[in-house]
Regions:
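Conserved class I S-adenosyl-L-methionine
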Residues: 78-89, 97
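Glycine-rich SAM-binding Motif I of class I
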Residues: 91-92, 113
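Short, glycine-/aromatic-enriched active-site segment of Class I SAM-dependent methyltransferases
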Residues: 180-197
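A short glycine-rich, Lys/Arg-flanked "PGG" loop and its adjoining helix->strand segment in the class I
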Residues: 158-175
């Protein structure tokens, strides 16, 4: 009898849940009969030899590794802060915030039933399912927010930054994922939704950054996400700080250098 690789990992107690199993598999840490396997849906006989190598994923999903990089490289602190995790899904970002000392996290997502059970049970987490961030107002949260992460799909960041800015404290900060496949025009997105042209990456980062500046955010940092998105899409982390007025100063680093460094590292 054959079963999916993620199911086999759970059955053998090599992962706590199928979501965690998928994360470990996609991270390239699972070997079947000595060969690396990175597709959770591949089926194998239930007698096959499976080995998990490398570090155990410290969060409920691999998304936590993205925020972990931002916290480390951008000198972001969430210790003792009230946060929102916009596009929370399973809760990798929420988990990362809690493990870095966040006092409270509002996990906001348009979907339902996705947030990991461990986080649902945590009294520091407020689960806001079936909630469209575009219509969230400060009164819905009931308290000022110090920090927000954003990891949304099928929508541009230019549609969600302003409502989040409205509920942030005056010195509030954001770490958001820029996903070229959801920012570029349809004609610039290739097969399987992958954006391969460097010039398009430059364009979409610039578009998001200039928009953020125009509504009162200062760009503090931009770097690539350590983990690719579905189908191998390269994504970027942008670090923003709420500013009293529109910001016209230049970006910290020439965007072409950011994109060049990203492609040298990830486009293999």
């Amino acid at each position: 009898m054959k079963e999916r690789l993620d199911v086999l990992l759970v059955k053998r107690n090599l992962a706590e849940s199928r979501e965690k199993a998928k994360a470990v598999i996609m991270a390239g840490n699972v070997f079947v009969e000595g060969q690396r396997e990175d597709k959770a849906g591949t089926t194998f006989p239930d007698t096959v030899q499976i080995e998990v190598r490398g570090h155990v994923l410290p969060y409920v999903s691999r998304g936590g590794l993205k925020l972990e990089k931002a916290i480390a490289n951008f000198d972001v602190s969430v210790d003792g802060k009230v946060c929102t995790d916009v596009g929370s899904s399973t809760g990798g970002f929420t988990d990362c915030m809690l493990q870095n000392g966040a006092r409270k996290v509002f996990a906001i997502d348009v979907g339902r039933g996705q947030l990991d059970w461990k986080l649902r049970q945590d009294e520091r987490v407020v689960c806001m399912e079936k909630t469209n961030i575009r219509y969230v107002v400060p009164e819905d949260l009931g308290e000022p927010i110090d920090f927000s992460s954003i990891d949304v799909s099928f929508i541009s960041l230019t549609k969600v930054l302003e409502p989040i800015r409205n509920y942030l404290k005056e010195d509030g900060e954001i770490v958001a994922l820029i996903k070229p496949q959801f920012e570029a025009g349809r004609e610039k997105v290739g097969k399987k939704g992958v954006v391969r042209e460097k010039s398009t990456h430059h364009e979409v980062i610039e578009k998001v950054a200039l928009y953020a500046q125009s509504i009162g955010f200062k760009i503090l940092n931009i770097d690539f996400s350590p983990i690719k998105g579905p189908e191998g899409n390269i994504e970027y982390l942008i670090h923003l700080k709420k500013w009293p007025n529109p910001v016209e100063d230049a970006l910290l680093e020439d965007l072409s250098l950011v994109v060049d460094r990203t492609f040298e590292t990830l486009a293999k």
